[in-house]
UniProtKB/Swiss-Prot annotation:
Cellular localisation: Cytoplasm
Gene: hisG
Family: Belongs to the ATP phosphoribosyltransferase family. Long subfamily.
UniProt-listed NCBIfam families: hisG, HisG_C-term
Reaction catalyzed: 1-(5-phospho-beta-D-ribosyl)-ATP + diphosphate = 5-phospho-alpha-D-ribose 1-diphosphate + ATP
InterPro entries the record matches: ATP-PRT_HisG_long, ATP_PRibTrfase_cat, ATP_PRibTrfase_CS, ATP_PRibTrfase_HisG, HisG_C, N-reg_PII-like_a/b, N-reg_PII/ATP_PRibTrfase_C
Protein name (database record): ATP phosphoribosyltransferase
Length: 284
């Protein structure tokens, strides 16, 4: 069986399980379940702390896993990213007292508090910045006021917590993170490469289904090329004859976020009977 690590709690957990369900895999119904077997797909799911998943995968104990890119890099293990999954986006950044710092280079010789010491040490080493990293398990915003650090490196969403602590973001982002599918560096160790490929294709199908819709419309033959420029599809739109030989029916995949704009432009061009359908699953 393919052995897959899934986050058991936190912001990654619910979205990861939802995506796997959309990909056709059975998921747990009770949050207390730690292991679940899906015999129809010959796969076994292990629900683990997100921070531990990269460790289990990197050591080859489990074949693949879903975790955050930031947690993967912070673990400093022999695991690699296979596929970005498009949810749980976050940005890892520097912050310090208002007016104290303008760039990462000014951190030379300073103390930096973080919950991601592995990730931060790697970033500093790549840029030749010599700073002391102070690992904290949480609430790093308080470390400067308490005299533990001169600045911090942490995941930033709105920045409101930093402002309340009298701090501001500075420098370029350290890392832009999101949920990712990972495996042991160099591939799996138990002959499950084919099963991993199937998992990747299914997850890619979910990503495409979430990002695109199917658009159908009727248009006069002489306007097909102009219409196709608006709805090029992934390779090419499908064009079918209608009973009225002056008209054709067109079907194409279009980006979901552009649906209404494209419909308006098609209508202005002369298209009629414009319909939009959701995509529940696909293989590209």
């Amino acid at each position: 069986m393919l052995r897959v690590a899934v986050p058991n709690k936190g912001s990654l957990s619910e979205a990861a399980s939802a995506m796997l369900s959309e990909a056709g895999y059975r998921q747990r119904r009770d949050s207390r379940e730690l292991v679940m077997v899906d015999p129809d797909n010959d796969i076994e799911f292990f629900f683990l702390r997100p921070r531990d998943i990269a460790v289990y995968v990197g050591r080859g104990t489990l074949d693949v896993g879903i975790t955050g890119r930031d947690l993967l890099l912070d673990a400093e293990v022999e695991a690699e990213e296979l596929l970005p999954l498009g949810f749980a986006a976050s940005t890892f950044r520097f912050a310090g007292p208002v007016g104290d710092f303008a760039s990462a280079e000014e951190l030379e010789g300073k103390r930096l508090a973080t919950s991601y010491d592995g990730l931060l040490r790697g970033y500093l080493a790549e840029r030749g910045i010599n700073a002391k990293v102070v690992r904290l398990d949480g609430a790093v915003e308080s470390s400067v006021r308490l005299g533990v650090a001169d600045a911090i490196a942490d995941v930033v969403e709105t920045g409101n917590t930093l402002k309340a602590a009298g701090m501001e973001i500075f420098g370029d982002p350290i890392l832009k993170s999101e949920a990712v599918l990972i495996r042991r560096a160099g591939g799996t160790t138990n002959g499950t490469a084919k099963e991993v490929d199937v998992l990747i294709r299914r997850l890619q199908g979910v990503l495409v289904a979430r990002q695109y819709v199917l658009m159908d419309y009727d248009i006069r033959k002489e306007l097909v090329e102009k219409a196709a420029a608006l709805t090029p599809g992934l390779e090419s739109p499908t064009v079918s004859p209608l009973r009225d030989s002056d008209w054709v029916a067109v079907r194409s995949m279009v980006p979901k976020k552009e649906t209404n704009r494209i419909m308006d432009e098609l209508y202005d061009l002369g298209a009629r009977a414009i319909l939009v359908s959701s995509i529940h699953a696909c293989r590209i």
